[in-house]
């Protein structure tokens, strides 16, 4: 079978959806072949070594991503594919697929958390603008999909809270990531080369975009307040800072004289990323909204416990497996999260690490899950004229 992925950008710094595309392609069944159409500039450096066939139709001039090239390309190429996966919402990509497929080729939509009601409450003015697009366009993109894919059972009912029109064919896709390959000692060294200040320090790891949605301010503030309770524990904040927020976050750390214990290595990739997980004590994500959290699954794959807010949709099931501590997404909740970790005996931390590895193997190993997701099209009716 031939599968087409449609996504606004494959830039790793844009967040999780681009990684989803890569994983689904890499671990699809052997008899599947995949291509990607994207709105990226053909000269974008991150497209040079993708390892799969990419059709970049950019550059584009707006966040909506309109280009007349996309609809024309989809119509000209649709009959080469057995199914289409649309990644994300609120962009021209979904509308173009809806128009181009016209009942000829089944498509599914991966919202990637973009229907979470968090956005309605956090950005009310943007939500009203989305309503204007929802009724005539986005809702019908979902209604026309063979399936709308949600990555957790928690995400599915939450998606129905954002808009009162919410009839579609939903399916909970078993998602996750792939375990690291290579030598963990060499990967640790790659990380220490990127972040030498923690070579001989214990640390907690945040890995993701430096963004308000991720609760970075909660984590920094909580760490500042608890820094004296464990003077040998540091914090690593690893990720791209597209909003230039780091300077503001560092001010409170400097005021408390602990700025030298918070480290900012930027975005980590490859061995350095895996080395960060292996070298850490635990992974922390006090997010205000997290549909799945690939970094959470990556931490589990490395046998690291995870300290999560209750707004991470996978938090309850990971806590049930004994691999997570969970608290509410406030400064006080994040303080309790760190306090609970600091107060755990070493033996209990090690037991949580073993449970983390087992949790990953049983729930989030994409080597099997990817086959289930792309295999959906084998049950879809053929609708070509």
Question: Model-predicted segments: where are they?
Answer:
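Aromatic "clamp/platform" in nucleotide-sugar-dependent glycosyltransferases that forms part
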Residues: 89, 288
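Helix-loop-beta element that forms the nucleotide-linked donor phosphate-binding surface
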Residues: 156-178
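Short hydrophobic beta-strand element within catalytic cores of glycosyltransferases
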Residues: 305-309
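Nucleotide-activated donor-binding/catalytic signature segment of Leloir-type glycosyltransferases, i.e.
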Residues: 247-268
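Conserved donor-binding/catalytic core segment of Leloir-type glycosyltransferases
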Residues: 4, 177, 197-214, 220-223, ...
């Amino acid at each position: 079978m031939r599968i087409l992925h449609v996504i606004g950008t494959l830039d790793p710094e844009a967040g999780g959806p681009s990684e989803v595309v890569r994983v689904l392609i890499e671990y699809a069944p052997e008899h599947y072949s995949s291509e990607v159409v994207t709105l990226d500039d053909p000269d974008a450096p991150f497209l040079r070594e993708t390892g799969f066939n990419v059709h970049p139709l950019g550059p584009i001039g707006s966040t909506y991503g309109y280009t007349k090239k996309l609809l024309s390309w989809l119509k000209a190429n649709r009959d080469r594919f057995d199914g289409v996966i649309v990644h994300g919402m609120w962009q021209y990509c979904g509308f173009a697929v809806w128009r181009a497929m016209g009942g000829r080729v089944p498509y599914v939509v991966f919202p990637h958390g973009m229907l979470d009601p968090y956005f309605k409450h956090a950005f009310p003015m943007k939500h009203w603008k989305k309503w204007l697009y929802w009724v005539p366009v986005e809702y019908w993109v979902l209604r026309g999909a063979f399936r709308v894919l949600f990555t957790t059972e928690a995400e599915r009912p939450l998606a129905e809270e954002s808009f009162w029109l919410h009839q579609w064919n939903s399916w909970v896709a078993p998602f996750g990531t792939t375990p690291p390959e290579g030598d963990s000692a060499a990967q640790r060294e790659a990380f220490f080369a990127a972040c030498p200040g923690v070579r001989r320090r214990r640390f907690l790891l945040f890995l993701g975009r430096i963004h308000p949605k991720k609760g970075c301010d909660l984590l920094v503030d909580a760490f500042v307040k608890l820094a004296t309770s464990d003077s040998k524990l540091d914090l690593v904040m690893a990720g791209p800072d597209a909003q230039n927020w780091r300077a503001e976050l560092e001010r409170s750390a400097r005021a408390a004289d602990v700025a030298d214990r918070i480290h900012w290595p930027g975005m980590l990739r490859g061995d350095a990323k895996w080395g960060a997980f292996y070298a850490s004590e635990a992974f922390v994500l006090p997010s205000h909204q997290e549909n799945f959290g690939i970094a959470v699954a990556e931490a589990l794959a490395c046998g690291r416990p995870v300290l999560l807010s209750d707004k991470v949709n996978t938090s309850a099931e990971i806590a049930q497996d004994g691999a997570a501590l969970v608290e509410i997404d406030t400064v006080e909740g994040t303080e309790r999260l760190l306090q609970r970790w600091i107060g755990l005996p070493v033996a209990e931390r090690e037991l949580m690490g073993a449970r983390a590895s087992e949790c990953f193997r049983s729930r989030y190993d994409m080597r099997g899950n990817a086959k289930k997701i792309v295999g959906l099209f084998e049950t879809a009716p053929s609708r070509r004229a």
